[in-house]
Amino acid sequence: MNNTKCDIIKRERRNSNYYSISDTEYNGGWFIVITSRQVLDLFLHGAHKVIDNKEMLNRINVFPVQDGDTGSNLASMMRTIIHQSEEKETVKATLESVADAALYGARGNSGIIFAQYLTGLSESVIDRDTISIQEYAQASNLAVKYAYESIENPVEGTMISVMREWGTALMHAATNKDVISEIFEYAFEHTQSALKKTKEQLEVLRKAGVVDSGAQGFTFFVEGALYFLKNGASLDQSIIIDTINDTLFTPIEMNHTGEDEYRYCTECLIEGIGIEQHVLKETLKTFGDSVVVAGNTRKSRIHIHTNEPAQVFEYLYQQGSMVFQKIDDMFKQETVVNHRKSQIALVTDSIADLPQEIIDDEQIHIVHIDILYKNISYKDKLTIRAKTLLDLSKEDNVLPTSSQPGPKQIENILDYLSSYYDSVIVLTVSKVLSGTYNNFSKVAEKLKKPNFKISIVNTKQNSGAQGLLVKKCAEYISKGMTHDDIVDKIQADTARSKILVQVLTLDNMIKSGRLSLRAGKIAKFIGMTPIITLDEEGQGVIDGIAFSTEGSNKKLVKHIQKIMKNHKIAEYNIVHVNNEDGAKRLSDKMETIIGKPPVYITETSSVIAVSAGESAVALSYLLTEEVSNESF
């Protein structure tokens, strides 16, 4: 028997110490052992195989939700495994490193089930510097139970069915064969057979003519490991040959009805002491369905479909420290896969204030800003609303802070959109106010490729004014304008946009330090109500000062009257911080002057609420292109 090129095989004599021997000494009394380095190599090659087939997995993603993101989710987890896994002193410790990385990087239903399988594998293996292939096979078989137990309602014909077949076949082969590549190949052939059966086990797969995407992802993982065993080539030199018939991946026409009971695919990772996985799973069932809970007593990776992600997180914040959270809009994902209005995707951040109806109708993709309060991270407009945040901050003098979307969050959405669109236009909050623009620009440069254009536009605005620019950009896309023409138009529109914010309480300005305590007391005593705007570069400045709400309204009226002497207002909106009545009063005044109602009235983001304070109302407008040179 010959060693593989990567020298992955070691042998040991039964009931003796572990040591290597030469090929000529091999006989039936010897069997295989695996080291920490070798098991890590297997997993890294398997991970690369999944990443290489991300697009195929997205294309066949039908169950449980036809959102076309299984490939992206699994690829994201595999990248985390590649980047964070480490070789340790024992095989068990190495597998724990892999499992921890998987829990951190897991995305989606399949990702979390896969992560729990890896957790089960790490917990089932013996803690030694090497293990036999029989011991590895036994641990793989036991790991399947962990995967099953993590799911609320296990369904056959999915990833778990293929995992079970892999574990069973590996056990059988390990007792009858001595060459590790032959053992893996035997088990892989049975895994392929189980994969093909998924096409008939689930009606939705049979109708679509595809195998289960998650099951295919696991099969690719095994195939990558097997390729390494048989060839031993480095990843850069590998030419991976698919062994599964291409007919399994015939293009499909999604026919999802969009009538799912729950809209948001909600995920998180919590850490703590004595976490009870079964208790989490039972409680989470009351918030939605598709519940998957993976992990151990130290950490838990959670997946659930729900309409109330804020309620889910309110419960989970009590169970441990929130390390990671992610919420996907399945309605939006289904729209992307089946009902794209254009091949140009439109993205903005959650500081842009827009009604959900416009966001849905215009297929606008939102990247949510992180809100930090008392060591807890919230997702703006998803896991917390402005009113709730202000109510919390009233309890003490701690003012919530915000954090721009991180590079990984941005990369995930742009990478996902690249699977379905030809180009992306991103409109960000003023880069003077946030690092969002710079983060998007850096990620866009990283993801640059010939057939996928990404343009990042600094709106130099925020809140309602940013919302108007996003709405206008969506209209340009709907008209069928080219990518470059749209970018040029929007950049010109930014100079014709304006926001005026009535700050009706100075409490948050005092808490933040923008106004000293002494000056704040004086300003509050005389009833000062400043009007804040953004200058030409997007920096916040004071536009005027009034001494009552009525006085502030009068100043806004005068501002609009002055503007309309030389300009025409194309459209305007009004946004507010928990002050619907105040917004309606201002709307009535503006309609009388401008001659038409606002295009919408809506609540602000939590970010704006923290800055402007309770009851703030903002008027934003966009002028027509017939603008004189006079400044406004």
List each language-model region with its residue ranges.
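A generic structural motif
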Residues: 298-307
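Mixed-charge interfacial surface used for oligomerization/domain docking
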Residues: 145-149, 161-164, 168-299, 333, ...
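N-terminal glycine-rich anion-binding loop in soluble enzyme alpha/beta folds
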Residues: 347-405, 409
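Short, positively charged and aromatic/hydrophobic N-terminal segments
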Residues: 2-3, 7-9, 16-26
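Charge-rich, low-aromatic oligomerization/scaffolding segments with amphipathic character
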Residues: 308-325
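Acidic, glycine-enriched active-site microenvironments
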Residues: 30, 40, 44, 48, ...
